[in-house]
A protein has these predicted regions:
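C-terminal, non-catalytic "cap/extension" segments appended to globular domains
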Residues: 1-133
Length: 133
């Protein structure tokens, strides 16, 4: 949705008919969609939750939260694979508690994430968890 949303809202000429919006949506889908939705899909005309009420950009915070969550959980998966235990690895849990939970809002969230994972978040774990990689 983000690319479509940015392209739609960066146009300098007003859109005068719905077919132009659907054509833009199809252009974006052709470029980035892993799976093409059915041709009858009219998402821009029906998904008012994201496109109305000033909420549009804030909606993407949900996907960002999924990226952080999946990447953090991947640390537990990696420990389980390395140690042959379950994902309830004590050492990884301790690092998570200290870097994320104990720090709370005392520092920027990215600093806490980096303290836990040793790097910035990536999308690989999310793609894997959602069956896309």
């Amino acid at each position: 949705f983000s690319l479509f949303d940015m392209l739609l809202h960066s146009q300098t000429e007003p859109v005068t008919h719905g077919d132009a919006i659907l054509a833009l949506q199809q252009q974006v889908r052709d470029e980035v969609a892993v799976l093409q939705p059915p041709a009858y899909s009219r998402t821009p005309h029906t998904f008012s939750h994201i496109f109305a009420g000033g909420y549009s950009a804030g909606y993407y915070s949900y996907k960002w939260a999924e990226v952080l969550s999946a990447d953090a959980y991947a640390a537990f998966e990696e420990a389980a694979q390395k140690n042959g235990h379950s994902t309830l690895d004590v050492e990884t849990g301790r690092r998570y508690r200290e870097a994320i939970l104990e720090a709370g809002g005392s520092r920027p969230a990215m600093a806490s994430f980096k303290a836990f994972r040793g790097r910035e978040p990536g999308i690989d774990a999310l793609l894997r968890h959602q069956g896309m990689a």
